[in-house]
Amino acid sequence: MGSLNSIAVLGGGAWGTALAQTAARAGRKVTLWEHDAGNAEHLIAARESRFLPGVRLEPSIQVTRDLAEAARADALLLVVPAQVLRQVVTSLQPLIAPRTPLVACAKGIEHGTHRFMTEIIAEAAPAAIPAILSGPSFAADVARGLPTAVTIAATDAACAQALAQAMNSGSFRPYHSTDVRGVELGGATKNVLAIAAGIVEGRQLGASALAAMTTRGFVELVRFGKAYGARIETMHGLSGLGDLTMCCSTPQSRNFSFGMALGRGEGIESAAHGKLAEGYYTAPVLLEMAQAKGIDMPISTAVAAVLGGKLSVDAAIEGLLTRPLKAEE
């Protein structure tokens, strides 16, 4: 695959804007597509995202609401929620050239189908090259140009390398991989585990409990990954352990802050602050997939039970602490 000189970013929220900034700093021609008219007009007029106040758009970024214009780019970053990805890719399918890389930048699993993000892309746009970008990265850090490392994966090794090269800048370092499943799985699983860590923090159970929750959560991530074909080095890398460690330690993570609010006793609607964390949607799907393969995931099961109204936070914590003793894996 040749060089990718133009990048379109679909989604003008905080993460989409941050990735557009990164691509522009890497010297790419960047188009930022925003569906919402009000947000698009604000981006054009103010050259600043409502979600990243104080961060000025790079001069080379062109903002548009025309999907066909965005679809002409050499590669497209799809920065839309996991549950609407299929709808967006279906709209893109007739507009893109064959073998255009479509890079999912959401971390989740589709409801009903249990499809990972690249599987959705492959089904909705068979002529495209599916890819995934994931890793420990907050939009505010990336937008400000703070040092960040992520993983970009595609089964097409040349495509993964070309995407990493296209997004590489002085502060944003992408590693490339062909373990698409491992990269996707790490991002989706950590969403649920970060809610658990947030509950521990919100309940003020202490640093020891938070460390235990994060570590045992990683054990669950590895179990799930092995069962679904992920490579062990991927789970120990940026998109697995790296992302989990970050999102289980700071309220900058929406899943962690959502869990903190639940731990303080807030209801789900109040804890969501107007937008539910992706882990809320992923938890029941993750549980179904774990049960289908007989994978023991007690922390994820407890989170799903709390979110489904089947257990109180205190009952979930008690259940985890009173499990039979066992050898450490």
Swiss-Prot record:
Catalytic residues, chain numbering: K190
Binding positions (NADPH): W15, H35, K107, A139, R254, L276, E278
Protein name as it appears in the record: Glycerol-3-phosphate dehydrogenase [NAD(P)+]
Catalysed reaction, written as an equation: sn-glycerol 3-phosphate + NAD(+) = dihydroxyacetone phosphate + NADH + H(+); sn-glycerol 3-phosphate + NADP(+) = dihydroxyacetone phosphate + NADPH + H(+)
Molecular function terms from GO: glycerol-3-phosphate dehydrogenase [NAD(P)+] activity; NAD binding
Residue positions binding sn-glycerol 3-phosphate: K107, G135, S137, K190, D243, S253, R254, N255
Taxon lineage: Bacteria, Pseudomonadati, Pseudomonadota, Alphaproteobacteria, Hyphomicrobiales
Annotated GO CC locations: cytosol
HAMAP family (UniProt xref): NAD_Glyc3P_dehydrog (MF_00394)
Major localisation: cytoplasm
Pathway(s) served: Membrane lipid metabolism; glycerophospholipid metabolism
Family: Belongs to the NAD-dependent glycerol-3-phosphate dehydrogenase family.
UniProt-listed InterPro entries: 6-PGluconate_DH-like_C_sf (IPR008927), 6PGD_dom2 (IPR013328), G3P_DH_NAD-dep (IPR006168), G3P_DH_NAD-dep_C (IPR006109), G3P_DH_NAD-dep_N (IPR011128), NAD(P)-bd_dom_sf (IPR036291)
Cross-referenced PANTHER family: GLYCEROL-3-PHOSPHATE DEHYDROGENASE, GLYCEROL-3-PHOSPHATE DEHYDROGENASE [NAD(+)] 2, CHLOROPLASTIC
NCBIfam families recorded: PRK00094.1-2 (NF000940), PRK00094.1-4 (NF000942)
A GO biological process held by the record: phospholipid biosynthetic process
Root EC class: oxidoreductase
Residues spanning the signal sequence: none
